[in-house]
Amino acid sequence: MVLCFPLLLLLLVLWGPVCLLHAWPKHLTRAHWFEIQHIQPSPLQCNRAMSGINNYTQHCKHQNTFRHDSFQNVAAVCDLLSIICKNRQHNCHQSSKPVNMTDCRLTSGKYPQCRHSAAAQYKFFIIACDPPQKSDPPYKLVPVHLDSIL
């Protein structure tokens, strides 16, 4: 039993940063946080676009992809055939056509002085969708997670 406590403590220390990477601000719904992180109707310079996300999380996010489309169009992907997500859940959906995106990657700096580079992309994407919460738009399903870019 004495050996279990240090092992448990080590697991908690290692798990903490992983949990923070996938957390979202609790005053936002998952769909609203998805919109903030991944929908930018017209391209913005990455440092400016990422500052909004970094201000919520209080750290420099290493990588983020913005779709240049409306929330309504991205949410429409949730109505397409469901597929298996990376986490083995069955609530993912693939876009039927590629869309313009900007991939932002951290190049230097520490919060709040984060610096990101930009790469334009035209690709398909896979999103996870869930039923909306009370304050979400009234769609049958709403996007809550960017699962992958193809």
From Swiss-Prot:
> Positions of the site: Facilitates cleavage of polynucleotide substrates?
H59
Report the EC code(s) recorded for this entry.
3.1.27.-
Keywords assigned by UniProt, alphabetized: Antibiotic, Antimicrobial, Disulfide bond, Endonuclease, Glycoprotein, Hydrolase, Lysosome, Nuclease, Secreted, Signal
Glycosylated residues, chain numbering:
N55, N100
Could you say which residues are annotated as the site Critical for catalytic activity?
Answer: K61
| Cystine connections | C46-C104, C60-C114, C78-C129, C85-C92
Enzyme class comes to hydrolase
- Active site residues according to the UniProt entry: H38, H145
Q: Which cellular component, as a GO term, is one annotated location?
A: lysosome
Span of the secretion signal? 1-23
Give residues annotated as binding substrate. K61, H62, Q63, N64, T65, K86, R105
Q: Where in the cell is it found?
A: Secreted; Lysosome; Cytoplasmic granule
Report the function annotation for this chain. Ribonuclease which shows a preference for the pyrimidines uridine and cytosine. Has potent antibacterial activity against a range of Gram-positive and Gram-negative bacteria, including P.aeruginosa, A.baumanii, M.luteus, S.aureus, E.faecalis, E.faecium, S.saprophyticus and E.coli. Causes loss of bacterial membrane integrity, and also promotes agglutination of Gram-negative bacteria. Probably contributes to urinary tract sterility. Bactericidal activity is independent of RNase activity.
Q: Which family does it belong to?
A: Belongs to the pancreatic ribonuclease family.
Quaternary state and interactors? Interacts (via N-terminus) with bacterial lipopolysaccharide (LPS).
Q: Which PANTHER family does this UniProt record tie to the protein?
A: RIBONUCLEASE (PTHR11437), RIBONUCLEASE K6 (PTHR11437:SF4)
Q: What is this protein called?
A: Ribonuclease K6
Question: Which organism was this protein described from?
Answer: Miopithecus talapoin
**Annotated gene:** RNASE6
